[in-house]
């Protein structure tokens, strides 16, 4: 039996990291009886260990809640919990496209942050009704009135009816439920008799059921036994079970218009289910597909290599399994003279990279080395063709290239006034171009255009340390612009080390090269011969350090004696060292790679 449309509410919770949206989701589940108290744990919807530990949401999750409103009517509330971090913005955009309304959660002590803005504008673009919720009003530092004004001033939406809550203590939760029912709209359309039309919101892999596909039904009915077709890929599947999450997985007979639920159907790989695809019945297809999403494009690339070459097979299996669940993560095989076999992987951003690396190390027990992260450059070649470059080591000969373009981002930074000077200097040092500076209460809102390759290294860490952790940062890619970029190679004993080569801006090349050489000098152990470490652009060396040789005192056995005798022994030693240097191999310890790639400023 499908629920009537006007008794369904589909909504998501939009907030900056740590403003308490997963805790609010917990309270909503608890107060509508979605889980028994004994099953309650904090952040019920953050199912990965790493999500709970870092206190962040990575995968969007959904829950169906039954709620009896004060007017005595029963409603079905479908809550979609979304990530707040900029790297997972595409998870947010998918979730928002599947809903009609949003709860905007703002911390009553901290106010509007950079990602609050980014996510709220996405919700407004999707024509969402927005209910403002001020959380953490029980904190001594909470200033609900000031924050209410701030929301109206910065975002431009009416916050006079904002709901004041404390998700931790449960204060004000009934008011939130009433606001969802009375202020958010029901699904806009939906005809149970029309051909099936459903939107694929997410999918993940289950060891027993194969791929579980999360869908939002627009028209028609999805039930067991139907043969469905994915309109994007043309693939057909037989539906084996349909169900909903409450958050426990519960099978139901059918899913009707406006509802959220899941189905399984012997789908082997998550890559077969494209997010944003339209699902329809094979026998009676819908005439018009839904406007799809752009697939998530990897922004940052880096090489992942096992510390022990024998673990390569395990790494191969592990990246394959992770790809099952994370369609935005891409990889291809790569070999490096210094590090052996590994994979060149693409990520949505640095947090995504860190999380994938941590999941590989944790869930699959691997020890990994990550090479320096790089972005996707566009090379305009002399013959008029355009080539994308993911790995600086693969750069063609300079004479073939007419120009190099690099990706630029538009960054929004919110910071307390006291730290503004330091942050402006940081952005300036990173070749930033200031686009705007305005004030939100006592905080400055900066808009900067920055090259992504300057942000990838350690911009976020520097920003946090300059602002003592108070600044927040959000960005989106804007375009590609031509830059004066050069490939810097690192040579150890006159042999280039491919894993350490990088593309840098010509003005920063010397500083970067010097830092790298100094760092390697500390990290590579002394050998019996002298080792030069050089940073070079093409054939021109721009920085050099030398590791001195270990030497034996060959003149120790001459008691006083004749100077020509000593000379002879020293010259003989010198000759040997020279020959040794010609044929000697320098062993660079793995530790040195790991440390050298952690560049500081």
Curated annotation (Swiss-Prot):
Reactions accelerated catalytically: GTP + H2O = GDP + phosphate + H(+)
Subcellular location: Cell inner membrane
Gene Ontology MF terms in the entry: GTP binding; GTPase activity; guanosine tetraphosphate binding; ribosome binding; translation elongation factor activity
Any one of the GO BP annotations: positive regulation of translation
tr-type G domain span: 6-188
Entry-linked InterPro entries: EF-4, EFG_III/V, EFG_V-like, EFTu-like_2, G_TR_CS, LepA_C_sf, LepA_CTD, LepA_IV
Domain of life according to the entry: Bacteria
Membrane topology: Peripheral membrane protein
Entry EC no(s): 3.6.5.n1
Keywords: Cell inner membrane, Cell membrane, GTP-binding, Hydrolase, Membrane, Nucleotide-binding, Protein biosynthesis
Gene Ontology terms: cellular component: plasma membrane
UniProt-annotated binding residues for GTP: 18-23, 135-138
Family annotation (PANTHER family): TRANSLATION FACTOR GUF1 HOMOLOG, CHLOROPLASTIC, TRANSLATION FACTOR GUF1-RELATED
Function: Required for accurate and efficient protein synthesis under certain stress conditions. May act as a fidelity factor of the translation reaction, by catalyzing a one-codon backward translocation of tRNAs on improperly translocated ribosomes. Back-translocation proceeds from a post-translocation (POST) complex to a pre-translocation (PRE) complex, thus giving elongation factor G a second chance to translocate the tRNAs correctly. Binds to ribosomes in a GTP-dependent manner.
Similarity comment: family membership: Belongs to the TRAFAC class translation factor GTPase superfamily. Classic translation factor GTPase family. LepA subfamily.
UniProt-listed NCBIfam families: lepA, small_GTP
Name of protein: Elongation factor 4
Native source species: Mesorhizobium japonicum (strain LMG 29417 / CECT 9101 / MAFF 303099)
Gene (UniProt): lepA
